[in-house]
Amino acid sequence: MPGPPALRRRLLLLLLVLLIAGSAGAAPLPQTGAGEAPPAAEVSSSFVILCVCSLIILIVLIANCVSCCKDPEIDFKEFEDNFDDEIDFTPPAEDTPSVQSPAEVFTLSVPNISLPAPSQFQPSVEGLKSQVARHSLNYIQEIGNGWFGKVLLGEIYTGTSVARVIVKELKASANPKEQDTFLKNGEPYYILQHPNILQCVGQCVEAIPYLLVFEFCDLGDLKAYLRSEQEHMRGDSQTMLLQRMACEVAAGLAAMHKLHFLHSDLALRNCFLTSDLNVKVGDYGIGFSRYKEDYIETDDKKVFPLRWTAPELVTSFQDRLLTADQTKYSNIWSLGVTLWELFDNAAQPYSNLSNLDVLNQVIRERDTKLPKPQLEQPYSDRWYEVLQFCWLSPEKRPAAEDVHRLLTYLRLQSQRDSEVDFEQQWNALKPNTNSRDSSNNAAFPILDHFARDRLGREMEEVLTVTETSQGLSFEYVWEAAKHDHFDERSRGHLDEGLSYTSIFYPVEVFESSLSDPGPGKQDDSGQDVPLRVPGVVPVFDAHNLSVGSDYYIQLEEKSGSNLELDYPPALLTTDMDNPERTGPELSQLTALRSVELEESSTDEDFFQSSTDPKDSSLPGDLHVTSGPESPFNNIFNDVDKSEDLPSHQKIFDLMELNGVQADFKPATLSSSLDNPKESVITGHFEKEKPRKIFDSEPLCLSDNLMHQDNFDPLNVQELSENFLFLQEKNLLKGSLSSKEHINDLQTELKNAGFTEAMLETSCRNSLDTELQFAENKPGLSLLQENVSTKGDDTDVMLTGDTLSTSLQSSPEVQVPPTSFETEETPRRVPPDSLPTQGETQPTCLDVIVPEDCLHQDISPDAVTVPVEILSTDARTHSLDNRSQDSPGESEETLRLTESDSVLADDILASRVSVGSSLPELGQELHNKPFSEDHHSHRRLEKNLEAVETLNQLNSKDAAKEAGLVSALSSDSTSQDSLLEDSLSAPFPASEPSLETPDSLESVDVHEALLDSLGSHTPQKLVPPDKPADSGYETENLESPEWTLHPAPEGTADSEPATTGDGGHSGLPPNPVIVISDAGDGHRGTEVTPETFTAGSQGSYRDSAYFSDNDSEPEKRSEEVPGTSPSALVLVQEQPLPEPVLPEQSPAAQDSCLEARKSQPDESCLSALHNSSDLELRATPEPAQTGVPQQVHPTEDEASSPWSVLNAELSSGDDFETQDDRPCTLASTGTNTNELLAYTNSALDKSLSSHSEGPKLKEPDIEGKYLGKLGVSGMLDLSEDGMDADEEDENSDDSDEDLRAFNLHSLSSESEDETEHPVPIILSNEDGRHLRSLLKPTAANAPDPLPEDWKKEKKAVTFFDDVTVYLFDQETPTKELGPCGGEACGPDLSGPAPASGSPYLSRCINSESSTDEEGGGFEWDDDFSPDPFMSKTTSNLLSSKPSLQTSKYFSPPPPARSTEQSWPHSAPYSRFSISPANIASFSLTHLTDSDIEQGGSSEDGEKD
């Protein structure tokens, strides 16, 4: 616009200049005459032209300018101060908080981007409560203020209604961070919809003054209400109101925590009361303005409620107080203080302390807690206990949900009559105060929700009971093991220390035996001997030993042998209290125990025949426990290890699997036969453990037995009578349950050459049990085939009386007193030496289990015996061959310390569930040639002589023995490996079958088993041998990885002949049960340990997951020396009748002698005697040598846990002759009892010096002792044993041996980890009931359960620390199902046995916790019927261990069946333990609807 005017101006100026110039030029005109006229005219004309032009231009320019000025488009706005654009400015919101700008003004809203979105939940735009129209709010008054600004009481208009609201207004000067904090503080109340949480009605965030609109609680905050109503807060109604309010406060906080919201200032002042007296947890942010006395100000001008703040949130730096943000744990602390306020009339916490005092005493020193509230109310102590839970260290505090549950329970209980079971239920509800990382519980995804939400860090142990089509499935999870006394005591591998995982799956057979025998197969004892898993598993009455139908789950944590000893002593104490049953129970306990040793050393160690002085020094019992006695060890050994293990050890392993319950029948069973009380106990144990191996063993009595002229018909008759007595008394329920078995056994015996009368008696007494086992599996035929797979070599040395007693003991008649010569005792010691020791030489029963028998042994039933038998048999052959070469070897075997002998006896007892039965039979057979009494005594004398001879030989051949053990290891590895595969897997369950501590001095079941197993060696039942070793807790043994693998034959010089049938890797052909009576302090175990060594070393666990199993192979190898630890241990020190089977091959005799030498110490024997477990005829001399003879096992053996055990036990020469202490070591079902028995004898002697296993005083995983086991006597013994254990603890070898032994069955890996006692879950009729969960499985139990069983109450009982989840699915983790199927069977049969030592140790350790926990539950179809149904298992189950032991320890899972069976066994049912902090079990108990009966009561009961 300026351009044109400038141009025009220029033109105008130019025109003016021209005009001026023209006028100037024309002005001067001279006045001349006429002549000058023309020029003037010219100038004027040019001038005119110029002027005209100038005018024209000027006019144009002027017109142009005028037009420009008049042009409307031209705007000079830039020159003006125009403020019209600023009219849109909105005045500050503070000036018009509720007034919006005029409509004509353009408004810019706050960008949504600047607003923080809720972290948890963003409500839909349609339902945005935040869109509360500001104009709908009307402020009434300001009621307080906070850091954020003002809090106003107002009204909100919604349509035609008006409601009171509380408005929190954020100050306009708030920065973005403060805005974010302001909105986040309101998030929980905006998102959560809960009746006990304050509701945020809406948010106003479209304009600067952010508003949060909350519901208004008419009665104000709870603190002011209580203070105002203090005068009226009296009476029951007001107390109930306060209790309800407490529950509502906890519920509100729990709802916040569930969605991970935290309360910024939880206190009574921030709990608001509605008009209907409902409490709402919230925060208006005005606490400080209304209750300034409750807050203190920090140097940075921040205020916080000191008296409600958790100590961990407050710290000081350079005299400046610093506070951290709230956490869930700190919220729990504040919750406790809030509840205290509620119950104390809204008093100020620590009102007697100044803020500085509170800061020092409560926050910094943490030594002051709030006193008990003044409110008088029912269970006021429990209410206060809940508050105290909230003030524990952060990791131990309960979750808000736990607090709410506890308060709700207390509130309900306060409103009803007091319940008898209140304490139990309360304990069940109590949160676990032991801190744990919830991540540790991730093993079971199904538990993740519970672990994260509820248990979280606090969940120590979780037992999951899942009801499946197969029955109840048990999953046990516990925290990663902590280094504890187990670790300290364990000399085991470094790997075996921390977390011990044990998977326990009850085998169908186990269940059926436990729950009820087949409909038509009830024993005289009233126990059926079903081969299937019973539909209903009776609950084991921990306190009612007389209940034959009682069954329980026993978990034992892998730990050092010492640990196991610790617990076994506790068990021992109880056993000692009741000497009659001590043997069986001890046997049971011992069987559970496993020595933690290296595989190589384990085998040798278990073979007490090694020359290593360590071995010799170890008491036989220890040896037995470590090796032969603990089928668990065998179980956990790998296939190779099992192969390495002599067949007898395999049998023992199988015995543990199948005869787990049989193991529980301590040698006391035999005593029980003699003494009704004992008989009862034994019967129970028998019932509990299927007598797989031993049942088969008697059937497997080999031709040697039949050929043994020494067998006294009277003895057989006595055995039979005892057996019948047990049966009639329902003591031999498991093995005796089947008359079919009895008949079969009788037939077998007849075939074997037994007189019908003898067979009748023995079958009736011991054979009934055995037959039951046989019923479970073809094991019965073992006797016939047994008749001597190896001829004389496969002699089952049955001390006439001891064997009888063993048979009487039924599965428990494992002849704890008698030491199974699992070692290579069969090595041919000069026949003369054996006969020379006629007394000591028990008749050797060549109990060879035919392959099917062994297979059946592998099945829960027959497996147990075959393992030992095969081991023994193979050993016998090897020994026979070797003995001839080096009689010293057998002597060396004999040289095993008496403790070894005791161990052997115990092991024998435990191992020879059937074996004990066999031993009885054998003894009877032995006695047959002689007059009952005369022959019995004569035989005993001979046995003693043989033992002495063996002792001499042992001294000579200790080194040879070591070599032999090595040879055995290698040969056994070749033979026994196979045998062990078959034996260890199949036989462990049966091992606990019959235990007759009385006269059964030494049961060289190992030889017989070795021989019989030798033929079946190829069959690998390793999985049964040891529980699944997968890291996955729920993994079952059945899984392929659990199969035992043949160990390198290099295992020591294991005698090739040891497993004569070593070629058969799978199953021992015919278990040869050699039961030798150990004369004074003679140890048949030495020989046995060798065999075990071979087997154990040979076997190793495939799975790298379970440290337990990993260690178990070692343990197993430890066991290997006596392949059947039971057999080893079973050798009794008690003198047996002189009569020696003339036909016994020298090796068999030697075996017998060795077995006798392996016999438990005098103490053990005497214990057995005193427990009247040894009541078997044949004057069972209570091991005359109080100090176990120190036999020097072979170097390998010495290095092996067995040798260590032997050494320790021997070192426990202080091992007092435990006349009152049962020496029985039931390695399988009664592993714990065996262990106890062993512990009583071996621990008293060697444990006093070595093993702490029996130490109940040592805190369990849960830091609890097994005092609750009801084994007060055992505990006492355990204390003695503990002292011994402590001593032994000093002797790491023994300690580790025991631990390895116990842990062996569990897993070598677990062995490596600290062995934590596994809680023993006891089920008993008297216990709480999970009846709904315990449903009979028709499929599993082909035979209808006996009416009694059906009528019986099923109960799962836990004590305070067990959390039980009941899920209606196959397995908590589906992946476990298939695995469970495979591994379950073996696990059931094997894990418990395999964990025999670890299991025992756990039983012992966790006994304290578990027994305390009272963990007992009954499962009907927890496990697949078929796999677990191995006849051995069912027999084992039918012949449960005596209740006494069972009440202390859950019976080991039914004996494992052969591979074929246990892969099938209960894929879904499993009881697994996964590493978790062993510190404690979660007190929280969740029950499924299935547990209606048990439900709350059961829950409480669980506690």
Curated annotation (Swiss-Prot):
Residues 32-42 are lumenal. Coiled coil: none annotated. One of its GO terms (biological process) is early endosome to late endosome transport. PROSITE patterns: PROTEIN_KINASE_ATP, PROTEIN_KINASE_DOM, PROTEIN_KINASE_TYR. It comes from the Eukaryota. Mainly expressed in skeletal muscle, and weakly in brain and pancreas. It is an enzyme of class 2 (transferase). Keywords: ATP-binding, Kinase, Membrane, Nucleotide-binding, Phosphoprotein, Serine/threonine-protein kinase, Transferase, Transmembrane, Transmembrane helix. GO terms for molecular function: ATP binding; myosin VI binding; protein kinase activity; protein phosphatase inhibitor activity; protein serine kinase activity; protein serine/threonine kinase activity. The modification Phosphoserine is found at residues 806, 886, 1107, 1305, 1307-1308, 1310, 1450, 1496-1497. Residues 970-984 have a biased composition (Low complexity). Autophosphorylated. Phosphorylated. Residues 597-606, 1277-1296, 1409-1424 have a biased composition (Acidic residues). One of its GO terms (cellular component) is neuronal cell body. It is a multi-pass membrane protein. This is Serine/threonine-protein kinase LMTK2.
